[in-house]
UniProtKB/Swiss-Prot annotation:
<dbReference type="InterPro" id="IPR006195">
    <property type="entry name" value="aa-tRNA-synth_II"/>
</dbReference>
<feature type="compositionally biased region" description="Basic residues">
    <location>
        <begin position="327"/>
        <end position="343"/>
    </location>
</feature>
<dbReference type="InterPro" id="IPR004516">
    <property type="entry name" value="HisRS/HisZ"/>
</dbReference>
<dbReference type="Pfam" id="PF13393">
    <property type="entry name" value="tRNA-synt_His"/>
</dbReference>
<comment type="similarity">
    <text>Belongs to the class-II aminoacyl-tRNA synthetase family. HisZ subfamily.</text>
</comment>
<feature type="region of interest" description="Disordered">
    <location>
        <begin position="324"/>
        <end position="343"/>
    </location>
</feature>
<comment type="subunit">
    <text>Heteromultimer composed of HisG and HisZ subunits.</text>
</comment>
<keyword id="KW-0028">Amino-acid biosynthesis</keyword>
<protein>
    <recommendedName>
        <fullName>ATP phosphoribosyltransferase regulatory subunit</fullName>
    </recommendedName>
</protein>
<keyword id="KW-0368">Histidine biosynthesis</keyword>
<comment type="pathway">
    <text>Amino-acid biosynthesis; L-histidine biosynthesis; L-histidine from 5-phospho-alpha-D-ribose 1-diphosphate: step 1/9.</text>
</comment>
<dbReference type="GO" id="GO:0004821">
    <property type="term" value="F:histidine-tRNA ligase activity"/>
</dbReference>
<dbReference type="GO" id="GO:0005737">
    <property type="term" value="C:cytoplasm"/>
</dbReference>
<dbReference type="GO" id="GO:0000105">
    <property type="term" value="P:L-histidine biosynthetic process"/>
</dbReference>
<comment type="function">
    <text>Required for the first step of histidine biosynthesis. May allow the feedback regulation of ATP phosphoribosyltransferase activity by histidine.</text>
</comment>
<dbReference type="InterPro" id="IPR004517">
    <property type="entry name" value="HisZ"/>
</dbReference>
<dbReference type="GO" id="GO:0006427">
    <property type="term" value="P:histidyl-tRNA aminoacylation"/>
</dbReference>
């Protein structure tokens, strides 16, 4: 008998659901265009060396690759669109002067079976601001994301802001042994203050840094910025990261973005992001509906160094949140704090 099932982790999208995704993507592209972002259409396949150059070490296991019969080249189905845009930005400076505001939508495919029933093929829409650094660019990304979520009907979403180097500064200053550093990152990903306190007692760094280590697990929600300022006085390396977060928030609020919270213990995107990070959380979604951040080291890997920041909206999770908000879902879902993986 003919087996009509799909490969594991893949699914068909029927007309009603497809219509929801198409409508959502069109509204997002409308907002991106209003902010000056120009749309790109990119191929599904890339050379493997290009894809690998643009991914974090943790994301390399997500690459689905094969030998192209005609050329013998090893090619990959894109697991992320950002490296493709970095490749194009480096290859075509004539067509993409700096700063470049670019947007896209389309599917990405990941080799591993996703956790918690998440499909391997994910539909995204996003923006990349290439060649622009500093607080103004960080704030612009926050504003575009907030306005995009409002436009699609997720005005109740909250944008949570962090920084890739804040926790790094504390963990570096605490003086942990290499094995203990890995344990610290694992504990922080679980917001396990007790485990961090136990590690701090065995650390060899300054007293201030050791005291700050368990505090990382508490630096989210109301009062997080005030607690972070006190912590940063004990760990000078954390002060610069905190200053970048506060500058971006200040400018974003001047432009009317109020639904913002802070999580300076966020571990998403380790080894990929270099500055301000952010994620959008909406009631009813199974995970973050959007995620992004600053990745200033990526463009240099493709031969055109420069700062960059961007984000992607997960169309499936955004649709899920909208359906629950409109009462179409059968049962409520508890949103998880962390996105499923870095962009």
């Amino acid at each position: 008998m003919l087996d009509l099932s799909l490969p594991s982790g893949l699914r068909d999208l029927l007309p009603d659901h497809s219509a929801h995704l198409a409508e959502l993507s069109a509204k997002l592209q409308e907002v991106f265009s209003q902010f000056g972002y120009r749309r790109l259409f990119l191929p599904t396949l890339e050379r493997l060396d290009v894809v690998e150059r643009g991914l974090s070490a943790a994301a390399l296991a997500d690459v689905m690759k094969f030998v192209e019969p005609g050329s013998g080249e090893v090619v990959a189905i894109r697991p992320d669109i950002t490296p493709q845009i970095a490749r194009l930005y480096a290859a075509r400076p004539d067509a993409l002067p700096s700063p470049a505001r670019l947007c896209y939508d389309g599917p990405v495919l990941r080799a591993r079976e996703a956790r918690a029933g998440r499909p391997r093929e994910v539909y995204q829409a996003g923006v990349e601001l290439l060649g622009a650094g500093g607080a103004s660019a960080d704030a612009e990304a926050l504003v575009v994301l907030a306005r995009a979520l409002e436009r699609v009907g997720l005005g109740s979403a909250v944008v949570e802001v962090g920084h890739a180097r804040f926790a790094h500064a504390v963990i570096d200053a605490a003086g942990l042994a290499p094995k203990a550093r890995g344990a610290a990152w694992d504990a922080l990903s679980r917001k396990d203050e007790g485990a961090l306190a136990a590690l701090a007692r065995r650390a060899r760094g300054s007293a201030g840094a050791r005291a700050a280590l368990p505090e990382l697990a508490t630096l989210y929600g109301d009062g997080a910025l005030a607690r972070a300022r006190a912590l940063a006085r004990q760990v000078p390396g954390a002060a610069a990261a905190l200053g970048e977060v506060e500058a971006a928030l200040r400018l974003a609020r001047r432009r009317g973005v109020e639904a913002v919270s802070v999580d300076l213990g966020e571990t998403r995107g380790l080894g990929y992001y270099t500055g301000v990070t952010f994620a959008g959380y909406a009631p009813g979604a199974g995970s973050a509906v959007a995620a992004g951040g600053r990745y200033d080291e990526l463009l240099a890997r493709f031969g055109r160094p420069g700062p960059a920041i961007g984000f992607a909206v997960d169309l499936e999770f955004a649709t899920q949140a909208l359906e629950r908000a409109n009462g179409r879902a059968k049962r409520p879902a508890r949103p998880r704090r962390s996105p499923p993986r870095p962009r």
